[in-house]
UniProtKB/Swiss-Prot annotation:
It is an enzyme of class 5 (isomerase). The lineage of its organism: Eukaryota, Fungi, Dikarya, Ascomycota, Pezizomycotina. Belongs to the pericyclase pydY family. It comes from Acremonium sp. InterPro entries: Pericyclase_pydY-like. This is Pericyclase pydY. Signal peptide: none annotated.
Length: 185
């Protein structure tokens, strides 16, 4: 289902489901990130519901970003909350190891300097893209992930464009999500 035009990252609390027919294979990316084989296979078979919430913190004025991955069948999900301030946050994630994550609003100009693939086809404008940079400290890899909106065959979708670099190896992929609707609260 199309993401409505009035849904943006400036102030949202909405959910999306993976559109496998429009997604690229994540196998190379997950391998480069050190994901075990069995987890890579599960990731390619399970359709995760994604919830994204953004809001302005009344005390700091910063935009906050909450990302939830909810797999089916009662499997454990993952939730992460960040300020869009690009201040590093270190954490350990099962199957990915020690990470240093920075999150901010992204612009096409900034993203093109990293890799022209990142902003390709995405809607441009203020607050239209969120850039998450993840340093994989255990394996010396860097992932740039862009959350945005893209029109594909006349339909507006939530899209993530991802570039992973590990040494001289580079993986690029696009994940596409169908809009499931607003969330309460």
């Amino acid at each position: 289902m199309a993401t409505p035009g009035n849904v943006t990252f400036k102030n949202t609390h909405d959910s999306w489901g993976m559109n496998w027919g429009l997604c690229d294979s994540s196998e190379q990316m997950l391998t480069m990130q050190g994901m075990p084989w069995i987890m890579r296979k599960l990731a390619s078979w399970i359709s995760v519901t994604v919830v994204i919430k953004t809001w302005t913190d009344p005390e700091t004025g910063e935009t906050r970003f909450l990302l939830q991955h909810n797999p089916p069948m009662g499997l454990p999900g993952m939730s992460e909350e960040r300020a869009l301030d690009y201040v590093p946050d270190e954490l350990t994630v099962p199957n990915l190891g020690k990470l240093r994550v920075r999150t901010r609003w992204g612009t096409a100009k900034e993203l093109d300097q990293l890799d022209k693939y990142l902003a390709r086809g995405l809607e441009k404008g203020p607050h239209s893209m969120i850039h998450m940079m993840t340093e994989h400290l255990d394996i010396d890899a860097v992932t740039h992930q862009i959350f945005g909106y893209e029109e594909i065959d006349g339909t507006r979708y939530h899209v993530r464009r991802i570039v992973v670099r590990k040494g001289h190896e580079v993986a690029r992929l696009r994940l596409v999500y169908n809009y499931l609707g607003p969330r309460a609260g």
